[in-house]
């Protein structure tokens, strides 16, 4: 079925001899300009689409590929070449106030084609829209605003993919809306969806690990706990200050009842996140950051390696250092960037010794990126990372370079 869907999409791209035209509103060269007109919640639509003749759909997408040479404690696998992903967007305006958008991702390493987003939006009022289908839960900012060409780094933030389960999609529905006045903009989202299961504490990582739930494809048809996952977010933006968002995701994750008989206590997980982005005056430095706190009700019979409290986040700084016409590229930009990251999967102390539990890491990643156009980025990164095991033994030290390209098409 997935293969047929991809073939259909590719066929649409070639079946028209009419010249395609990209919506100029989506080709703003300045990231700052696009941010002023939108919130992170608009990321699913704030992409370049190509209209093909009189076909009722618009297409788009992006691809990512990179080289890396990374080693841990002096041991390296040498040069590695990776085609990370190719993603296709399909959008359609069904009628006035009704539209559809989907995001289909192919990851060769995972040997799978996955639908990450496929939802129908019905607008009743700018502050009241109904969304139904396969949604991206708005926890933090990265989960919704994750397109590779928007970032100066070859790797996604560790806290977004190894603490939170980005990209995290579920079957569900809910409401969203936004409004603005003068320099201010306000937006909200509230969804009920399927969600997590026992795999977050029963996995090969042998720790509390939310991303393990992504492997359960049954969540798109069946909710193990029988109780919906709630995800909500509010965001406020001022054009001269930036955007701040507060989000929450929580619900019962375990199977606590079977055939009407209670077989376990209800066990909840709660995730709180805050995100912020702004462009600093004078130097035009772009800053974006996200931090999340995770609380999981772990059974008392589990060992202490399964943490009930976790937290982590990242901060990105991007400084334009050169902007000029190069070859046929107008306003090509050279950036210097830096990412700082921290994740702790097990906050607390051992009951027997009172010493701190480990299982954490920190990372620093300087980068240089070149954007010939706003839609394409070439990026050279160096990562240095230290990770401690649960016993706080001397950390494993990882370092190395990566170079990659990511572009919309």
Where are these regions (language model features)?
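Extracellular/periplasm-exposed beta-strand and loop segments of Gram-negative cell-envelope proteins
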Residues: 145, 159-165, 201-205, 217-223, ...
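A generic structural micro-feature
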Residues: 53, 80, 112, 165, ...
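Bacterial Sec-dependent N-terminal signal peptides
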Residues: 1-22
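N-terminal periplasmic/intermembrane-space "pro-region" immediately following the signal or transit peptide
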Residues: 18-64, 409
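Outer membrane beta-barrel
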Residues: 46-70, 75-198, 226-231, 235-243, ...
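A short, charged helix-loop
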Residues: 188, 192-196, 206-215
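Loop-centered beta-sheet repeat module
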Residues: 208-257
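Outer-membrane beta-barrel pore domains
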Residues: 22-26, 30-33, 74-75, 118-123, ...
């Amino acid at each position: 079925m997935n293969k047929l869907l991809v073939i259909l999409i590719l066929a649409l791209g070639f079946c028209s001899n009419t010249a395609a035209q990209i919506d100029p509103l989506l080709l703003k060269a300045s990231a700052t300009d696009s941010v002023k007109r939108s919130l992170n919640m608009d990321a699913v639509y704030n992409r370049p689409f190509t209209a093909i003749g009189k076909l009722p759909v618009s297409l788009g997408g992006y691809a990512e590929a990179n080289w890396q040479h990374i080693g841990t404690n002096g041991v390296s696998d040498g040069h590695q070449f990776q085609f990370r992903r190719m993603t296709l967007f399909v959008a359609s305006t069904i009628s006035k106030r009704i539209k559809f958008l989907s995001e289909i991702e192919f990851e060769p390493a995972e040997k799978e084609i996955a639908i990450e987003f496929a939802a129908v939006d019905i607008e009743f009022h700018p502050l009241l829209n109904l969304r139904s289908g396969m949604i991206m839960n708005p926890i933090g900012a990265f989960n919704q605003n994750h397109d590779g060409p928007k970032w100066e780094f070859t790797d996604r933030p560790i806290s977004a993919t190894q603490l939170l389960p980005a990209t995290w999609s579920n079957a569900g529905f809910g409401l969203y809306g936004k409004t603005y006045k003068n320099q201010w903009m306000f937006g909200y989202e509230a969804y009920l969806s399927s969600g997590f299961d026992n795999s977050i504490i029963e996995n090969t990582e042998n720790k509390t690990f939310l991303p393990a739930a992504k492997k359960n494809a049954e969540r798109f048809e069946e909710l193990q706990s029988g109780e919906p996952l709630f995800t909500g977010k509010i965001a406020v933006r001022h054009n001269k200050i930036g955007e701040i968002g507060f989000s929450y995701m929580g619900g019962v994750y375990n199977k606590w009842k079977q055939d009407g008989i209670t077989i376990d206590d209800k066990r909840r997980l709660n995730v709180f996140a805050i995100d912020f982005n702004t462009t600093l005056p004078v130097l035009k430095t772009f800053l974006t950051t996200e931090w999340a706190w995770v609380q999981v009700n772990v059974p008392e019979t589990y060992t202490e390696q399964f943490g009930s409290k976790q937290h982590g986040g990242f901060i990105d700084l991007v400084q334009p250092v050169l902007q000029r016409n190069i070859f046929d590229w107008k306003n090509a930009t050279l950036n210097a960037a830096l990412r700082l990251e921290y994740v702790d999967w097990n906050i607390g102390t051992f009951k027997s010794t009172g010493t701190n539990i480990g299982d954490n890491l920190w990372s620093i990643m300087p980068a240089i990126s070149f954007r010939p156009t706003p839609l394409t980025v070439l990026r050279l990164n160096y990562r240095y990372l230290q990770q401690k095991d649960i016993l706080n033994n001397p950390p494993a030290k990882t370092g190395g370079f990566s170079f990659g390209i990511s572009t919309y098409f």
